[in-house]
Amino acid sequence: HAGNKIATLVSLSANVAGAEEAARNVAMQAAAMNPIALNEAGVDAAVIEKEIEIAKEQLRAEGKPEAMLENISKGKIQRFYKDNTLVNQDYIKDGSMSVAAYIKSVEANLTVSGFKRVALG
């Protein structure tokens, strides 16, 4: 992809009917959307702390009351996970579902167990 400069590998939890196509589709998702982690657990705590601080600073600049900052920043972190973790991203071939929901539609017990994205240049 991208002039043969991006490669992705995807690991699924089982080899069931449709798994090969599903893995190919998820690999395409990872190549196109450049997630930083598989799921919430894979995101470094320092990244989350930084995102929370950025969100709070933006909210303060907008004049939001201090009492509301924590709840609003939690919502912003959920949005961060949705945009930046592979299984929570909107599936590029069907934006009405997440990647996790797409995988479940292939096989109820199927999950994405890992991925690796490499870009040259």
Predicted features, each with a name:
Residues 1-121:
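N-terminal assembly/interaction segments in proteins that build large macromolecular machines
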